[in-house]
Amino acid sequence: MLQNPELHYLDNAATTIVAPEVADVIDKAMREHWANPSSLYGPSARSEEALNAARAAVARTLGCKAKELYFTSCGSESNNLALLGAARTRTFGKDIVVSGFEHPSVQRPLEDLAKRGYNVTVVKPRTDGTLDINEMLEHVGKNTILVACMMVNNEVGTRNDVERLAAEVKRRNSRTIVHVDAVQAWMRVPIKLDNIDTLAVSGHKIHAPKGIGALYLSDRLVQAFQPPYLGGEQERGLRPGTENLPYAMGLAAAAARLAKTMKSRDTAMRALNQRLRDGLAAFPEVVLNSPADAVPEVLNFSENCIKSETMLAFLAEAQIYVSSASACGRGQPSHTLAAMGRDPLAIDTAIRVSFCADNTPEDVDAFLNRFEDGMKHLQRIKK
C-alpha cells in the first residue's frame, strides 16, 4: 500500500495503513449514508440498514450474534467500557484478577478500581512472556467479579490460552465476568468466544482507520450489564453518541478483507519472522524477548548495547520505522519486559518489529542492514 519503495514500515502492532479498498468504502459511505441512523426519515432508514449490515459482518468474523456486537471508537474504549461496566454490574464481591502485562487501557482502569476499594491481584508472566493460567486460577474465588487477560501481547507477541482460562474461571465461579483484550489477536488468530463475556477489538490494527473499534458483550450478560456511560440510546444504550457509520462500514470491510487470507498471511508472516530471527542471530549481543511460539507478526528483542531511542532515530533516518514498546506507553519503559524480569539494560535497548501482509523480505533486509550499521557506529551504553 506504500507508494515509496524506500520506506519500510515495520510497526504494524502500533497501527496499520488503511487499505485503499477500505478507504473507498468509507469515502462512499460519507457521501451516500450521511443521515443519522437514529432518525425516522428515509435516508436515516438506509443508514440504519447499512449500520446493521456492518455490525453483522463484523460479528461473523468473531462468531457472535450481531446483537452482541457494539461499535466503539477504539480498542482502548472497548476495554474501559467492559472493565468499568463489569465493576458496576457485579456487586457480590470486590476481587479482580488480571495478568501482569496488559495494555494500559486495561491496567489504568483497574488501578482506578483499586483506589476505590477493589482487590486487584496482578499475576506476573513467566520470563518467556507466557502466562501461567493455573496461577491466575488460584486467585479465582467466590468473591471474584472479574478476570481480565489479553489474548496476544502487544509488545512481545505471546499468545495466552484465554479459552482455557475462561472455561476454568466459569467452573470456579459462573458469575465471574471474563474479559479479553483481543486487539492484537483479531484477524490474526482464531477466536472462540465460549465462556468469554466481553472482548475488545480495534480497527486500526487491521487496516481500518483510527477511531473505530468494537466490543463483544455476551447475551449472557447484556441484560444485567451496567455501562459507565450515560447520555443516549445509541448502541442499545451501551455506548451513547451518534454512531460513526462510515468507519463502522470501513471496519466491516477491513475485517472481511482479512478473513479471506488468514492462513496465507500466517505463512507469509512466519517466513518474515524467521528471516529476521536468522538475521539477528549474527549479532551476539542480541537477546530475543519474543519466544519461538509467539505470533509471527511481532518480534521483540534487546540488543543490549545502544539505547532504543538512539537506534530508532538512526533507523528512521533511513525511513525504516519500528518501535521500542507500546505506542500507548510512549516515553515509558516497557512494563511488559519489566514484568518478564528483564534487567534495565535489556528494557532500555529493546526493539519491536511488527509485520503485516504488505511487508516483504526486502523490508527485513533493509532493517537488518541498517541495524548492522547502527551496531557498528552508534554510541554504546557504558556498562
What are these regions (language model features)?
Residues 1-383:
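Pyridoxal 5′-phosphate
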